[in-house]
């Protein structure tokens, strides 16, 4: 059907599906550098592709619509200035050195937390799909049942965790 696959990997830095890094599975992979992400520069993002035609188009769109082969004042496409600044690039380069190490640490911590709370009635964690060979653990997801805590609302439960120094917030 000639359908393009665009991966939303905004929160999946260093994650892998069946041993293949996310962002390299589809025609385009998109990642975010927003401040809350595992790899961050305050804002921004990047796109990955192995398709040279798409790479040229993306380059043009992020570079004011310029053509990679044309003069700097030629703008065959309508684009914007989405180029990464030097300061942001420096922040990201320094983080890339430890990306895999930090991903492994998040994975160990995610497993340890899951194991530690698995017997608490009213708290259920999601079981990662076995095809996820490297989990990004951008967030740790759990389901809360107020019934198991005498009707304590989710918001009060979150408030209590935070009061004890355990960072917690509601999902999307």
Where are these regions (language model features)?
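Alpha-helical hydrophobic/aromatic positions enriched in membrane-embedded helices and signal peptides
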Residues: 19, 26, 43, 77-78
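Short clusters of hydrophobic/aromatic residues that line enzyme substrate/ligand-binding pockets
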Residues: 13, 22, 39, 80, ...
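Hydrophobic alpha-helical segments, especially transmembrane helices
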Residues: 12, 35-38, 44, 107, ...
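Residue-level signal for short amphipathic helical patches enriched in basic/charged
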Residues: 1, 36, 94
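Active-site PLP attachment segment
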Residues: 24-63, 86-91
